Every structure is written in C-alpha cells, then in structure tokens.
Amino acid sequence: MAKDWLEGIEDEYDVVVVGSGLGGLTGANYLAKNGHKVLLLEHHYQFGGLATWFKRPGGHIFDISLHGFPYGMVKSCRKYWPKEIADSIHQLKDGRFINPQMNVWTSFDREDFTNILVNDFKVDREKVEAFYTHLRQMNFYDDNTQTTGEMFEEFFPGRSDVHRLLMEPISYANGSHVDDPAITYGIVFSNFMSKGVFTFQGGTDTLIKKMVAELKNNGCEVRKCALVEGVDVDDKKVVGIRVRSQNTGEEEFPVRSIKCKAVLSNANVRNTIEYLVGENKFSEDFVAEAKAVRNNTSSCQVYMGIKKGETIPNIGDLVFTSKAAEYSIGELTSIKTSSHTFSVYYPETRPHLSQDRYTVVASLNAQWDEWNDLSEEEYQAEKARMCEECVSSLESFIPGVRDKIDHIEAATPRTVNYYTKSMQGTSFGTKFEGLKVSMELSDQIEGLYHAGSVGIIMSGWLGTMNYGVITANKMDKWLYEKAKAV
C-alpha cells in the first residue's frame, strides 16, 4: 500500500521551509527554537539537499559533498546545533596539488600555505602577507569591481602557477573563477586560511540524522518525499503553499494546501521566483533583474567503492590533479576536462562501522548545457568514459586499485537537477548578483524569504548554513513584529 508522507500534518503553520539543504535545516531549527510553528518539506527521500549520502550493495556508503569546509563550521555548529555535532568536526591535514605546474602537499592552513608560496614558489613573504591583509580587509559592502584575476595579477603579476594554486581549490569549493568579483574569493579563501580544511567524522548520514532529530526535538515538523508545487500569494503576501506526497509507487496523492505566514525557500532563487511563486507576482523590474542572474557551474562525481576487506594507502585527503598546462575555467568545467579532485574516505571517516571501509569520490566541475544536450546513448557513453578516466587517474596514485573497486557509478549535472530540482543542475547556486535578488524577495512579497546557495559567498557547507541563520533571524524579527501588531 502506498504511503502518504503528509499524513498527520496540520492545516496551518507559522513558517513553511521548502527544502532541507543545510540552509533550510539550520533556518528551520533557528525558527523552531525561537518558538515558531515550523513545517519543513523535502521532495527527496533523504534530507540534506546536496549534503546527503546514498548506499550501495557491498556495504558502501557514499557522501555526495562531504569533501571539506573551513573551521568556521565548528563555530556555527556550536552556536546553532547541539555541541556533539561541533565536536565531531575534525581537520583534514593532507591536501595535494598535482599538475604540470606543481606537486604540492599541504595542510592548507595559513602557516603551511605561506611557507609553500615563499619556499617552493619563491614569492616574497612580504607580498604574501600583504595579500592576506588585503583579503582580510575586504568588506561585502565595499563598491569594489575588481575581479579575482585582476587581484591575483596585482599581487603576483605573471605568476600563472601561483594563480592556479590560489584559485583551483576555491573553484571546486564554490564554482567561482578569476572573472568573478574578488570579494567572492576573499571571503571564502580567508575562511579556509584561518585553520585549514575540516570534515564531519561519522559521515553525512550521521550528521543529517542528528540534525533532523534536533529539529524534531525543538518541535519542528519534518517531512520528506513531499514536493512543494507552489507558494500561494494574495495581495503581495504569502498565505500558504501547495504540496503533494510523492515517491509512493503507482498511487498519486492529491495536492494539499497549507496555510502559513511565511515561506523560507531553500530552493534555487530563480526556481523560487519563476516556478514556486510565479513571475506575475513580482514587479517587472525585479523579474528582469532575477532573470539576469547567472546560475553557477554544476559538477560531476565518480563514486568508487573499495571491496570489503581491501585497503588502500594514504595518498592524501583531497588530491587536486590535472593534466592541463595552466588553470582555465573553460578546461576545468569542460565535459572533456582532465582536472578532478579525489576525496578519499578512510576508515576514520566512519569509525563507528564494524569493519574498516574505504571509498574514493572524484569531483569534476561541469557545464549544464554540455551534459543536457546529449542523447541518451551519448550520455551513457560519456559517463562510462568519465568513470574510466577517473579510475585510470587514481591508478597513478594507487597502482592496482582497479582490482580493489567493486562498485563504480557517475553523477552528472542531470543527476543534480533530478534530485535537487536545482535549475541547470547548479551545484553552487548563483553567481554574485544572485545574492541581492535573494535578499530582496521579502521587499517584493511579504513573508517570502530565501536561504538557498547563492552569490558564491553563501555557497558551500559553511556559507549555506550561515545564510540560513541570517535569513531566519530576519524572519524571526518580522514574525515577532507581526504578532505584536495583532
């Protein structure tokens, strides 16, 4: 018998949160802890958005995006989630950059990175320190039109190798590149340089289950397999949402209408405007501005599971490798790219498992159009090619690893789009101009807010979590004032 995933929900809530990415989860938790009646809806059968996982036969557990985040994640988790979540965050000390311009092994903290730039790349220490100082002094509200590439050239003129070392890991972290505003680079890079790269010990499955348990403990109603089909607006005010239970086999359940005072959309900001709400509910100028927002790049992953009982040597935690002569966003995002990052998950990732297990995930940046335009036959062939190239590349670090892999599969921008509904399969939300549109939604429609990955600086694990709190704080104040006025 098909299951109605919406069974038992009430007809009205203070806030409905659409989507359970880290921004949605954290925003929902903030609002629930502050006494608001919150309903969180996720269309997928797993919570977490891109911060999720999947299992495969053979005891494999694959993390979608648990590759690394800055130390600021510890502070945010301590502040907005139970202490045990923050206490499970551990440092990844082995990052590697291997390409025709360099072979670097680093802990990716400021001291080590500085020594590499000075000793290996022969950059004056004063110039490196001046660069760091410049990044720290950057302010989001400054009217600074300088691009990241222009900033690199100012401090390290003609040094394409240095530019590559500085830019490539951030391109993987949030999809940005040298033509984006320098502020988007400065904020993110400075966060990483604080104390290095960190991850969650226990895996994404453990993390998200703890977060969902905390949400329920704070009185938040959470439902998965629930697709929000639209936000209802009357007289420029949010009045409710429409949602349908799904993933239930052959039976189709009716659309449910839920009343609410406010909606926190954790969807793509353009999806929110163009599909969830509808363009006709906004001013023409705002719609034009929103449609001009560029979606960020997408990504591919190749998931490789090591057989039970087999081991692999320590080759580093994050291995950035490329055959490209120099850094190029065109090459980095091409369907034929030679650039990818191996995230290696050793037994320490999930120490609670009864047996030591190893997995490797290769991540590649990608362009939506290149993958979306393929026929089904071409699509399958490209996925197979990508898998083979990643295994061959991994063999250069671990000879014979092919024989130790008993599961391999690929995800593409199409996969991201299917499971997250994110426009053009973007893995990192929008380019910088999307942040202004996101922040001004409630100026257009009372009670409508957004906390999805946006503007580059609000992308990635830390950015989206913090943006969830920023937006939820605005909502909390608005709901409080609204209640006082009654």
Q: For the regions a protein language model found, what residue spans apply to each?
A:
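C-terminal segments that line or cap access tunnels to active or ligand-binding sites in enzymes
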Residues: 307-411
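Rossmann-like flavin
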Residues: 100-184
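A glycine-rich dinucleotide-binding beta-alpha-beta segment and adjacent secondary-structure elements
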Residues: 164-173, 396-458
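Mid-domain catalytic core of redox enzymes
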Residues: 229-354
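Active-site-proximal substrate-binding core of FAD-dependent oxidoreductases
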Residues: 233, 476-486
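N-terminal glycine-rich phosphate/pyrophosphate-binding loop and immediately adjacent elements
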Residues: 2-123
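Helical element adjacent to the flavin cofactor pocket in flavoenzyme catalytic cores
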Residues: 189-251
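A conserved FAD-binding loop/helix module that cradles the flavin
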Residues: 453-479
